[in-house]
């Protein structure tokens, strides 16, 4: 039995922003149609969906700049109604203290990787090994354990503008790829990133802890020993 693990935050925003000029009932109907289409595309026997609730452990980790401090606060008009609909009609779960991304990871790593498919449009989740489905591109793809680690260390280099995580100045995805392309294991990835940060372990640790998505409850990333 394959279970679809759905990051529902982006789903609500995508449907919500496209429905700002409509009535609430139309926005909910669009969400319902999107969910039905998703289930047909994936042909899964089961699904679990997650929404981000209150609190985030990352807020206390961010020292360089506030976590998500630059994020534009504009929200879709019907966001709350859409979230409530997914909870009441589809059984989605609101998680607190973590993000929906973390909840997807915890659920994915609790079972063998061929029993789930992670449904999202967020590159952050590409650090998880296993099957993924980008519902915007309608693309199914597989990420290996090492590919997931490389994606994670790439983000430590580049940072994440959306979440206000500051990377190295002048390093985007292309330069980051060049820095990491010779690496074959996690220690080499870490050493390459540490060298790029001129040995600043604290900055690497801070960015890593902000960017690392949980594989089990209460997990916080630590520097490789």
Question: Language-model features: where?
Answer:
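Domain-level signal for Mg2+-assisted phosphodiester chemistry and nucleotide/NA-binding surfaces
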Residues: 1-84
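Extended two-metal-dependent nuclease catalytic cores across DNA- and RNA-processing enzymes
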Residues: 27-30, 44, 68-224
């Amino acid at each position: 039995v394959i279970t679809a693990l759905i990051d529902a935050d982006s789903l609500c925003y995508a449907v919500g922003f496209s429905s700002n000029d409509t009535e609430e009932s139309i926005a909910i109907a669009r969400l319902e149609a999107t969910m039905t289409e998703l289930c047909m595309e994936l042909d899964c026997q089961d699904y679990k969906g997650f929404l981000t609730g209150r609190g985030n452990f990352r807020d206390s980790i961010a020292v360089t700049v506030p976590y998500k401090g630059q994020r534009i606060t504009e929200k879709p008009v019907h966001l709350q109604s859409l979230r409530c609909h997914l909870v009441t009609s589809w059984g989605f779960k609101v998680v607190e203290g973590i993000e929906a991304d973390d909840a997807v990871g915890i659920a994915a790593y609790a079972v063998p990787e061929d029993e789930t498919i992670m449904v999202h449009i967020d590159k952050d989740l590409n650090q998880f090994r296993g099957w993924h489905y980008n519902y915007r591109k309608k693309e199914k793809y597989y990420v290996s354990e090492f590919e997931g680690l490389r994606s994670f260390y790439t983000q430590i280099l580049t940072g994440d503008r959306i979440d206000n995580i500051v990377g190295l100045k002048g390093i985007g995805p292309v330069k980051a790829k060049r820095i990491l392309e010779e690496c074959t294991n996690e220690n080499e990835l870490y050493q390459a990133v540490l060298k790029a940060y001129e040995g600043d372990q604290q900055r690497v640790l801070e960015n890593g802890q902000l960017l690392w998505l949980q594989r089990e409850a209460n997990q916080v990333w630590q520097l490789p020993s």
